[in-house]
C-alpha cells in the first residue's frame, strides 16, 4: 500500500510546482507591455528598445544585423537613438538588464516574444566592475549569467533603455 501512496504524493507535488511555476511566468510576463519598437517594463518603470542596436523593428520583428560595439562607440549609438526616436536613451544598469533574462528559456535566455532575434551573447551594462575597475559588467543571453570581466575595447551587443 505504501508503494502506491508515494507516487500519488509525488504527482501532487509536481502539479503544485507546475502551477507555481506557470503563475510565476505569467506574473513576470504581465510586467511587460509590447509597443512595436519598444517594450514597457512596468516593474522597473523603463522602456526597452525591442531590437538591439543595429537591427530595426520591421514586419513585427527585429530585422537586420545587430552591431557589436566597443564601449566608446556606444555614445554615438545613444545620440542617434535620441535623435531618431526621441527621449533620453541610455545603457541599462546591471539590475535592469538582468531583469529581462529568462532562465527557463531554451536557446536564448530572453523572452523572444518580447525581444525577437536577440543574439545569444553578451550585452553591455553601464556599470564598471568595482573590484576590477578596468572591466565592465555584461549580461550574457546564452547563459543568462552576468560577467564583470569585459574591458571597454572588446565589442559587445547593446540594448538601450529609457526611463518612463
Which functions belong to the PLM regions below?
Residues 33-35:
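Short, small/polar residue-rich loop motifs at catalytic or cofactor-binding pockets
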Amino acid at each position: 500500500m505504501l508503494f502506491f501512496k508515494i507516487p500519488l504524493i509525488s504527482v501532487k507535488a509536481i502539479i503544485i510546482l507546475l502551477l507555481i511555476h506557470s503563475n510565476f511566468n505569467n506574473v513576470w510576463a504581465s510586467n511587460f507591455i509590447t509597443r512595436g519598437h519598444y517594450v514597457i517594463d512596468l516593474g522597473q518603470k523603463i522602456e526597452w528598445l525591442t531590437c538591439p542596436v543595429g537591427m530595426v523593428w520591421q514586419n513585427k520583428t527585429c530585422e537586420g544585423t545587430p552591431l557589436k560595439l566597443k564601449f566608446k562607440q556606444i555614445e554615438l549609438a545613444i545620440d542617434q537613438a535620441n535623435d531618431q526616436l526621441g527621449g533620453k536613451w541610455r545603457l541599462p544598469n546591471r539590475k535592469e538588464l538582468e531583469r529581462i533574462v529568462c532562465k527557463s528559456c531554451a536557446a536564448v535566455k530572453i523572452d523572444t516574444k518580447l525581444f525577437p532575434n536577440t543574439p545569444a551573447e553578451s550585452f553591455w551594462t553601464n556599470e564598471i566592475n568595482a573590484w576590477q575597475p578596468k572591466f565592465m559588467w555584461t549580461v550574457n543571453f546564452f547563459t543568462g549569467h552576468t560577467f564583470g570581466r569585459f574591458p571597454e575595447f572588446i565589442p559587445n551587443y547593446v540594448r538601450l533603455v529609457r526611463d518612463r
